[in-house]
């Protein structure tokens, strides 16, 4: 009992050490669990939402549309739970200039169901539900009416129907109808599209370069009132996928098994069958056209023959009348009846032989008959020409049919192809990667501080330990005094850390996340396993340090332990050998210098602890500086143009004419811009089209006219990149790249994420969904977005081959050779404000789809989630620095109580004692700061390079001010700790302290 009371008394006396260990454990466990828990809560809530709304696991698209046979074949694939055929329609409407929307049918199979936020779901024709983004951008509300106009080419495959005459959806007659929605609409509800969780009312600008939407808005309508049998895609749910977390590898493996089956069995057969359907439909159309033409020609020929017969009868009548009159005259003048009969016979005989001559004479003598004969001959000639021309045309179409219908391509995509899904996943993954790295530093510092604190605690009880061992107490029992002390401190600190880690930090992160994404049903959850492991990790580390400290002392005999420990012997230091410097240092300065290097363990612990905390602060500030400079570097340094304007192909000429003629435009470059995908060649079958796989990146494909290739360098800084461990890729690299016809130039952001370099082979998917293998000629410096530059000639080489032509663009060779330059890069005069205003005014023009001002993008770009995490990390690192300095300062004082007492006996004033002790701590702190600044730069560079976020490349930037802030903050913490330590020095009793050894 006395042993226990003494142990509790010792614990109460060492409350400062207890608080230090508990605080370090609290911070470490909070960092270890907090960022993880915040990301996990977001992952789980989003996964539950996706399962509830039936977000598709797989999407199948085809360059020739999907038929009922395709849908039936997909349903038979092993592992497919549900299949839903999609038939959207693109429409336009007037909202501050022309805006576009996708009319989406609310499926009946429970796939991709919108989440109702206000009002009710549409039930009958003419009712729609809209997204909150549309409500925000317009003055519409529930009950408002809207009129839309279908686009002329709203579907990729509707043109296929016009060109080839069939889509194959109706296999009995080979005819299709493009989707058609009501145009007079009434808003009855506000919904959230599960395919896009971006918060329209949020404060993030990330959507400016991550959005993959081809229209401005999405409207949801019921099946009532929707007509058409043309399917543009099919969405699938996979059996067992809902039971897995959509963000886990197990989910990806489950879905991959189904996509592999589709690729390996259904796709090839249905691609061939679909093309054959189109060929059969085309041949049937030609056969029907020939039959119809033959019928019309036969009718026309019958009409001509009837008219000619009537004409001949009229002429024959005239001939007969003239012949009869001649015979009658001869009979009247004849001598006898025999002579008359002979004359009649002769006349008839002459009529048979000279009938044609007489016909021609009669026709020639009559203008009416002449005109009638000419009309008949002309009609016959025209009919013959039409028959020959039609037959030639049909023969040509028969010969061209096989070449005009390309090979059908299926593209099998998973959820990664959804821009909103991939953006959320990449954001959370990047934050989680930071959360996995920083706790390591906290754990190392916790072990170091625990070793320092517990070693001093054991050393202070050295004589007491010897007494207990001498009295017969086992070494384990004696060591339990300190092990239980450390364990209790860890458990209390860890428990508080779990509260902060599973409640405080996640709540903070989720508030920031909800400013970027809409995540219904978000709730905080506790993970017993991870929480227990988090505490256990720090308990093991701290107890290991405590055991080491106990073993170091208890290996001695009780008699040796009960005697005072001999003071550490002094030694000459390097500075003493530099006589000119050493001789000019005062006495106290020399004592300080010797003390610093005399206690090497304290030197290592202090410098290491301070360096670690400083490095964490620098690392956090480095990430903040890197993100803060992304917009400026991209939109003011890399992009030399001031304005990018994009239009539909049909409005391209009008847009270019309008912009080029404006006086504010000083120079411009016509280009073609398409949204596409970049996939590492060899990561999968080129035909599989898995644009959403881990080896894929959404890109902006920029085609440049052949005659203006040299002008691209004036609009975009094409700078080759280099990379290093510090993440300074592209910095200091000289020279510029030239776009040629031998390959494409890939943006650094995409190249870094995919591991692509110059000479690599990649699979490019253009705006029409056509894939081709391309060579990477160079990688250019690019931080935001993923641009791929290609020359006009190389673009044609990639996508205009027979196998690459999309059915949508199945045109004559003359039409397919030229690209439509649907975008313009322009340099503007005037201030940033005037350039932004000009871009906004252009967006109101009906010929402009999008106008982007680089000045506006540079000023408005921000990455709020990363900024919030950086602020959290810096705050926690600052707290850790404060605890570390407090622990080291108290340990330093407890080690040197007799030394301080001696100074007081010698007549030192309190202020001089403060200065004597604090000077050593400040010097050690400065040494730790000097070591921590470059260490933080190194760690920050390694962490930011490891993020690999889609459409972003972190070119590490640490501003001088950040180094100053980190150094000043650490020094400020050191000064703050001194304010707490100085009263302790004042309370030292010289007499009792000097007699403590006795």
Language model: regions and residue ranges:
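Short cytosolic juxtamembrane segments of multi-pass membrane proteins
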Residues: 555-573, 983-998
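Juxtamembrane segments of multi-pass membrane proteins
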Residues: 587-741, 748, 760
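C-terminal transmembrane helical bundles of large multi-pass transporters
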Residues: 808, 822-824, 841-949, 953-962, ...
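Short, strongly hydrophobic transmembrane alpha-helices
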Residues: 15-41, 57-59, 487, 601-626, ...
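Membrane transport/envelope proteins' first extracytoplasmic loop
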Residues: 3-444, 456, 630, 634-643, ...
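Interfacial "coupling" helices/loops that link adjacent transmembrane helices in transporter permeases
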Residues: 6, 14, 448-487, 884-925
């Amino acid at each position: 009992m006395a042993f226990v009371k003494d142990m509790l008394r010792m614990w109460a006396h060492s409350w400062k050490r207890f608080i230090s260990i508990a605080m370090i454990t609290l911070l470490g466990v909070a960092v270890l669990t907090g960022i993880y828990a915040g990301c996990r809560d977001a992952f789980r809530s989003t996964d539950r939402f996706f399962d509830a709304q039936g977000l598709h696991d797989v999407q199948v698209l085809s360059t020739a549309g999907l038929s009922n046979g395709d849908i039936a074949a997909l349903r038979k694939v092993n592992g497919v739970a549900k299949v839903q055929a999609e038939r959207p329609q693109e429409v336009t409407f007037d909202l501050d200039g022309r805006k576009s929307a996708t009319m989406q049918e609310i499926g009946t199979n429970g796939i991709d169901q919108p989440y109702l936020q206000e009002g009710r779901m549409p039930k009958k024709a003419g009712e729609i539900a809209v997204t909150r983004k549309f409500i925000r951008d317009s003055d519409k509300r529930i009950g408002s009416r809207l009129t839309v106009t279908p686009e002329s080419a709203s579907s990729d495959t509707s043109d296929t129907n016009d060109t080839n005459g069939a889509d194959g959806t109706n296999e009995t007659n080979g005819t299709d109808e493009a989707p058609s929605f009501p145009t007079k609409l009434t808003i009855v509800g506000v919904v959230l599209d599960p395919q896009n969780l971006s918060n329209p009312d949020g404060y993030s600008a990330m959507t400016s370069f991550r959005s993959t939407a081809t229209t401005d808005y999405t409207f949801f309508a019921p099946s009532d009132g929707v007509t058409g049998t043309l399917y543009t895609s099919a969405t699938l749910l996979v059996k067992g996928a809902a039971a897995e977390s959509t963000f886990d590898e197990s989910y990806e493996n489950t879905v991959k098994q189904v996509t592999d089956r589709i690729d390996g069995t259904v796709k090839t057969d249905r691609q061939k069958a679909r093309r054959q359907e189109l060929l059969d439909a085309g041949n049937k159309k030609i056969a029907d056209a020939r039959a119809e033409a033959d019928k019309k020609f036969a009718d026309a020929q019958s009409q001509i023959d009837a008219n000619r017969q009537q004409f001949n009868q009229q002429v024959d009548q005239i001939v007969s009348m003239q012949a009869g009159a001649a015979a009658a005259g001869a009979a009247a003048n004849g001598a006898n009846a025999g002579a008359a009969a002979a004359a009649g016979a002769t006349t008839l005989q002459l009529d048979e032989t000279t009938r044609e001559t007489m016909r021609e004479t009669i026709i020639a003598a009559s203008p009416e008959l002449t005109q009638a004969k000419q009309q008949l001959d002309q009609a016959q000639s025209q009919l013959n020409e039409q028959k020959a021309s039609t037959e030639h045309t049909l023969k040509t179409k028969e010969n061209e049919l096989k070449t005009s219908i390309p090979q059908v391509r299926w593209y099998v995509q998973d959820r990664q192809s959804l821009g909103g899904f991939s953006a959320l996943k990449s954001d959370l993954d990047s934050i989680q990667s930071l959360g996995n790295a920083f706790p390591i530093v906290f754990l190392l510092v916790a072990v170091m501080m625990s070793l320092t604190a517990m070693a001093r605690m054991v050393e202070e009880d050295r004589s007491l330990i010897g007494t207990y061992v001498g009295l017969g107490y086992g070494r384990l029992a004696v060591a339990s005094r300190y092990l239980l002390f450390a364990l209790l401190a860890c458990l209390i600190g860890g428990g508080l850390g779990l509260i902060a880690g599973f409640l405080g930090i996640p709540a903070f992160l989720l508030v920031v996340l909800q400013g970027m994404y809409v995540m219904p049903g978000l709730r905080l959850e506790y993970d017993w396993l991870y929480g227990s492991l988090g505490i256990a990790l720090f308990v093991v580390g701290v107890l290991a340090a405590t055991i080491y400290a106990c073993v170091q002392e208890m290996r001695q005999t009780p008699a040796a332990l009960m005697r005072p420990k001999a003071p550490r012997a002094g030694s000459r230091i390097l500075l003493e050998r530099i006589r000119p410097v050493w001789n000019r240092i005062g006495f106290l300065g020399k004592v300080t210098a010797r003390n610093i290097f005399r206690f090497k363990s304290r030197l290592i612990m202090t410098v290491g602890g301070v360096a670690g905390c400083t490095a964490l602060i620098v690392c956090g500030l480095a990430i903040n500086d890197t993100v803060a400079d992304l917009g400026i570097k991209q939109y003011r340094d890399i992009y030399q143009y001031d304005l990018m304007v994009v239009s539909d192909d049909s409005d391209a000429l009008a847009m270019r004419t309008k912009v080029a003629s404006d006086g504010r435009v000083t120079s411009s470059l016509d280009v073609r811009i398409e949204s596409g995908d970049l996939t590492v060649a060899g990561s999968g079958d080129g035909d599989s089209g898995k644009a959403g796989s881990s080896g894929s990146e959404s890109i902006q494909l920029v085609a440049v006219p052949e005659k203006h290739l040299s002008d691209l360098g004036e609009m975009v800084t094409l700078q080759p990149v280099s990379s290093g461990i510090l993440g300074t890729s592209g910095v200091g690299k000289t020279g510029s790249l030239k776009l040629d016809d031998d390959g494409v130039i890939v943006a650094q952001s995409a190249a870094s994420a995919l591991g692509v370099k110059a000479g690599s082979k990649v699979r490019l998917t253009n705006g029409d969904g056509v894939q081709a293998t391309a060579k990477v000629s160079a990688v250019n410096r690019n931080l935001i977005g993923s641009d791929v530059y290609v020359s006009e000639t190389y673009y044609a080489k990639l996508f205009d081959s027979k196998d690459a032509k999309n059915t949508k663009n199945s045109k004559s060779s003359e039409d397919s050779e030229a690209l439509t330059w649907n975008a313009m890069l322009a340099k503007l005069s005037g201030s940033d404000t005037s350039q932004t205003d000009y871009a906004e005014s252009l967006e109101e023009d009906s010929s402009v789809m999008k106008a982007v001002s680089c000045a506006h993008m540079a000023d408005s770009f921000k990455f709020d989630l990363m900024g919030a995490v950086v602020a959290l990390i810096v705050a926690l690192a600052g707290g850790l620095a404060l605890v570390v300095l407090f622990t080291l300062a108290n340990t330093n004082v407890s080690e040197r109580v007799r030394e301080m007492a001696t100074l007081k006996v010698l007549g030192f004033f309190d202020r001089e004692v403060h200065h004597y002790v604090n000077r050593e701590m400040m010097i050690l702190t400065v040494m730790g700061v000097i070591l921590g600044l470059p260490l933080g730069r190194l760690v920050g560079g390694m962490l930011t390079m490891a993020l690999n976020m889609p459409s972003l490349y972190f070119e590490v930037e640490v501003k001088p001010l950040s180094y100053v802030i980190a150094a000043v903050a650490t020094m400020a913490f050191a000064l703050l700790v001194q304010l707490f330590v100085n009263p302790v020095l004042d309370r030292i009793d010289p007499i009792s302290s000097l007699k403590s050894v006795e």
